[in-house]
Amino acid sequence: MGSMPTDVETLSMYEAPDDLTREIDEHIRNSALAQSLRANPDFIESRPHLKIPAEVRHHNLTAGTLAGPGMIAVPPYYFNEKDGKSMVQIFYVGLDCSGHPGIVHGGFLATMLDEGLARCAFPAMPNKVGVTANLQINYVRPTMAGQYLVLRAKTTKVDGRKAWAEGWIESLEVAEGEEPQKLVEATALFVEPKHAKVS
């Protein structure tokens, strides 16, 4: 396995396999939200799924197993605020992530929140790594499949090897004049393993 790509390099690594996927990718990349975050110097844009080496990526749940047509159609775009203060993720969820027909499975949403809150909190931790100790989720309203979603997270507290984060998922697209509504929200506690310290 070679060296890990930089955040900037991940932005040009993805090649859409077909026109529909290319359209989804361009829609996210050119969305007003992505453009405003990209213009903010406090945020770093990346596509972390593409940092995982291709030869092992298919073993990763969100970058491999759940990635592809009908699921997480394209590698999500992440915008991390420096020092782990907050994070915004934009992604598309397809119809094959449904529990009931057309409604995204709650376990899928829990997985995305677990990973998203972790990616927000880890940079604030001493050695930038941790494991989920607690994840509490409130499902506010049904999340329809086949749409663009936004995951927003913020680190609320850091105490030694522990970091707390909270966040939610909302729709990217909203009617003119309306605010996005929370679809599902979560709080989490992450703990850095004792052996995580690198000498």
Q: Language-model features: where?
A:
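Hydrophobic beta-strand-centered segment that forms part of the acyl-chain substrate-binding groove
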Residues: 1, 8-12, 117-150
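HotDog/MaoC-like acyl-thioester-processing domains
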Residues: 1-53, 143-145, 154-199
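Flexible, low-complexity linker/boundary loops enriched in proline and small hydrophobic residues
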Residues: 47-70
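Catalytic strand-loop segment that frames the active site of acyl-thioester-processing enzymes
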Residues: 62-104
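Intrinsic-disorder/low-complexity, polar/charged segments enriched in Ser/Thr/Lys/Arg/Asp/Glu/Gln
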Residues: 73, 84-88, 134, 148-150, ...
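Structured beta-strand/turn binding interfaces of compact recognition modules in eukaryotic regulators
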Residues: 92-94, 140, 191-193
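Mid-length scaffold segments of soluble, non-membrane domains
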Residues: 103, 109-113
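Structural signal for hydrophobic/aromatic residues that build the beta-strand cores
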Residues: 113, 135, 151-153, 167
